[in-house]
Amino acid sequence: MEQKFDSKETPNKYQQAFLESKVETNDAVVAAEVEKILKEHIAENDNKEVYQFLLNCVDLTTLSTTDSERSVAAFTKKVNDYWTNYPQYKNVAAICVYSNFAEVVRGALEVSDVNIAVCSAAFPSSQAHIETKVAETALAIEDGADEVDI
């Protein structure tokens, strides 16, 4: 896929990387390969074990602008109650929240096999001083984050 840029514009470093890339893609070929994989492997992967594995890979996430200590605690309670409601399945891998809610999740989380993941470093825009990003991330880890998404 060839990237096109206005000839009057100087490419930024990302555009330059695309311009210099030797990787070629063809949407029709990719679609055909996906269809082939689905036809050849759907039956062997359409089972409870695969579904359980996939569910156990999920980071259950709330990144709402309206998140609060109360809403995040209620969200965490759903994970705590999961085995009561669905004892036949493994729990999710992690609860993911904004970094300032790591301590809320740590205080409310009652199951030991679920990690606490946070989005940090001025997520989602990352428009902040590097010192701010480092401090935010350090505080999230101090507050109980097991994983940090940047």
Locate each region found by the language model.
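Charged, compositionally biased N-terminal leader segments and the immediate start
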Residues: 1-56
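A short, histidine- and acid-enriched strand-loop-helix "catalytic/donor-clamping" loop
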Residues: 63
